[in-house]
Amino acid sequence: TSDDCLKGGSGVNDTDYHPFEIWKNMTSTIGPLDELWYRLFAAISRCNRALVSLDKYGNSKLGETETKQRIAEVKFLRAHFYYKLITVFRKVPWIDEEVFKNNTQEQTHNDAFTYQQLFEKIIADFQTAYDVLPETQTEGGRVNKIAAASYLAKCYLQLAWGDGYEQTTGISHINTSYMQKVVDYTDVVSHSHYGYLEDYGDIFLPEHKNSKESIFAVQCSDYKDDNTKFGRANWSNTLNGCWGIWSCGWDFHKPSQNLVDAFKTKNGLPEFEDFDQTPAHPVNGHPTTQKWDPRLFHTVGMPTFPYKYEKQYTL
């Protein structure tokens, strides 16, 4: 397939990732998938606990208005986690606050609801967030109405194609009422205070954190600020830093020639048919007839080009 990168790494604990690289022998019990399943359901469990607590203590502790908003925020997060689950695993057990209160998790099976029904439950949570939350929040990272609209558009877009039509190339099976909802919620986002930054590269720089292009983002923290041992950080950034020559470090997500070639363009459009027939790569300061999608230079570190737009860090 196109747009491949190489896993990299050579430790014995990296073998679980090899099936993803060759797209064979993938099972739900291999490390990365099993861990993803566990962590997402752990997050859903926390959401359910929060909903039960809000229902029991919210009005007396927070007041009716704030309780209603916090419930909407938690339901957004639960839907976010379930959206990830259904996208990766498709068949998943629906465990909500009622299942949690009745302690019937082990009796809840992954075939109790159809793909359509699961999406409808996810949509219901996002819809609650859309109906209740304001368009803006004063605290960074708190979800809002526009974030819910974005997810509703994504959900209806997947539902519109229909279940079981993965190999279908026509459009007659598409649900037009769902597609209209995609358009409607997309319009909400398009006419909101969110939008594209003027410079594509800015979205990768820390000074543009929570910019107008960031609709929903996890908020990381330093251990000095949150009283944890290591802080709430993005560990993947640590694994993919730029190390000096002869320096030790990690070696993950190595770009392949195929990935670079996928950024070739012709007349402003991607070269879908023959992009990988002749391997090539751009060289800074040496113009060629081959044109490239500028996103390549934000995706792959290449010799003669600076890392993170700093000339002193030219590779």
Language-model-detected regions and their locations in the chain:
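An aromatic- and glycine-enriched ligand-binding surface/loop that stacks and positions planar moieties
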Residues: 1-15, 92, 119, 127-130, ...
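Conserved, well-structured interaction surfaces
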Residues: 10-89, 105-120, 124-140, 271, ...
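Short connector loops/turns at beta-strand edges and beta->alpha or beta->beta junctions
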Residues: 52, 56, 99-101, 158, ...
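Contiguous, well-ordered alpha-helical segments that form the cores/surfaces of helical PPI scaffolds
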Residues: 73, 80, 150-157
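Short, well-structured active-site flanking segments
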Residues: 86-98
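Short, conserved phosphate-binding/catalytic loop or strand-edge motifs used
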Residues: 95-103, 151
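Short acidic (Asp/Glu) and glycine-rich catalytic loops that position anionic groups and cofactors
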Residues: 103-106, 164
